[in-house]
A protein has these predicted regions:
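Charge-rich, well-structured scaffold segments of protease-associated domains
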Residues: 1-7, 82-230, 265, 295-425
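His/Glu-rich zincin catalytic helix
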Residues: 1-85, 190-292, 331, 416-425
Length: 425
């Protein structure tokens, strides 16, 4: 298309190849595995420490999240202010975070300061004290945030759905409460920290402009971390027998609608097909649910379908927030789209569109060494191998309508889905 052409749009080319990053794997002195992606032009380093120490290993509910947040709020030699000021002095960012399965510590730093910051992280790993005043503040803030969240229909619906899918005692299913936050004691945090934050369940992921000097300082610090842990995997809980939950709300204008069911982790043979199928259903702006409920009917601003996968399982869900006057029709249309995928093969044009969309997503995910490191971390921490991304990309390229329909029949039958409504009576 030249500058004067106002009639014909640019040609759309198919993405046939995604260049995967080269991952350098090595082991520290203490046996901790490191996955490194070196590259880029900026003098920035990202280091992620991932411990298998999340909810499945809790002796008491909510302890892994509290441990994650509070472990950097004081050590035997530094209080929280000193730690924060030390990190700020070097212009770095240090965050602790958690998902349901892991505890994560993430550092972004200029290359020249990594050697000064890693000893601070080592102090957190070895000498965290969990000061009572920090625990008290954490409990107050968490309860305040919980009260705010529980005023939102969409939050209540999410909590009810995951509890119904996994069970109220399952690590993926139980919900936070004020009583659980109030019940957290310093001894609980110390126990979880000492029994679950060790070198044997640690994996390190690095990205950026890495060379031998960075590898050396990582080994001289993180490679000397040793703590024997006594982990116990605890996954109790039974899913709810209720298939339909309807809860009233003070929000008189909107109803949160959720559908869902228990699935599997990303190593399951049907994961790729479900990933592709759910994208067609509600995973992008031009998806079937979005085109129907938003663009055509005007029932909602946003409707979405997704698959969440964890180490020990996963689930499929549909999410929509609609005006109360559109609840019945929205549910009818959602079920209609599910049945259509079960009964009718996907047309080639739509298959090609979604393949191109997903391939473009893969390209964006792998843009730069820091993003690449995050992708590799996501794969490894969910029990997959480094080469599983290549397998997924190839599976997307080769996906066919027969495989998609088989997956729809197995997993998208509306009669097998749990339905949650929070809002209108």
């Amino acid at each position: 298309m030249n500058a004067a052409d106002r009639v014909n749009g640019p040609r759309i080319n198919t993405i046939n190849k995604v260049i995967l990053p080269e991952v350098y794997q090595y082991t520290l002195d203490n046996g901790v595995p490191v996955y490194e992606i070196s590259g880029g032009t900026q003098e920035v380093i990202k280091i992620e420490l991932v411990f298998e120490a999340g909810r499945p290993y809790e002796a008491k509910k909510m302890v892994s999240k509290a441990t994650t947040y509070l472990m950097k709020e004081g050590t035997s030699s530094k209080d929280s202010e000193t730690i924060a000021e030390s990190i700020d002095f070097y212009g770095a960012t240090l965050k602790t975070s958690t998902n349901l399965d892991q505890i994560k510590i993430t550092l972004y730093s200029l290359k020249k300061h990594v050697g000064q910051i890693l000893p601070i992280i080592m102090d957190i790993l070895e000498e965290a004290t969990f000061p009572q005043r920090e625990i008290d503040m954490y409990q107050r803030n968490s309860i305040q945030n919980l009260r705010l969240d529980l005023s939102k229909n969409e939050v209540i619906a999410y909590r009810e759905l995951t509890e119904a899918i996994f069970g109220c005692d399952h690590p993926y299913g139980y919900n936070s409460t004020e009583a659980l936050y109030d019940g957290i004691e310093r001894a609980d945090l110390l126990q979880h920290y000492q029994q679950n934050v060790g070198h044997s369940n640690l994996t390190v992921f690095t990205g950026g402009k890495i060379d031998d000097s960075i590898r050396k300082v990582i080994n001289e610090t993180l490679g000397q971390f040793r703590r024997d842990i006594k982990q116990k995997l605890l996954i109790p809980g039974e899913p709810s027998s209720q298939m339909r939950l309807q809860l009233p709300s003070d929000n008189n204008y909107q109803t949160a609608i959720r559908f869902g069911r228990k699935l599997f982790n990303r190593n399951h043979e049907d994961y790729h097909a479900m990933y592709f199928l759910v994208t067609i259903l509600g995973g992008y702006f031009g998806s079937r649910l979005m085109s129907n409920l938003r663009e055509d009917k005007g029932y909602t601003y946003n409707v979405y379908a997704g698959v969440d996968d964890y180490v020990h399982g996963g689930y499929f869900y549909i999410s929509a927030d609609v005006g109360n006057e559109h609840v019945a029709n929205s549910i009818k249309e959602i079920k209609s789209e599910l049945v259509d995928l079960m009964e009718n093969p996907v047309e080639e044009e739509e298959m090609t569109l979604v393949k191109n969309y997903l391939m473009g997503n893969f390209l964006n995910m792998l843009d730069g060494p820091l993003n690449q490191s995050q992708v590799i971390r996501s794969l490894i921490s969910k029990g997959s191998e480094v080469n599983s991304l290549a397998a997924m990309i190839e599976s997307v390229k080769q996906m066919d309508k027969v495989r998609l329909r088989e997956a729809a029949i197995k997993y998208l039958d509306p009669d097998t889905l749990i339905e949650v409504q929070v809002g209108s009576e």
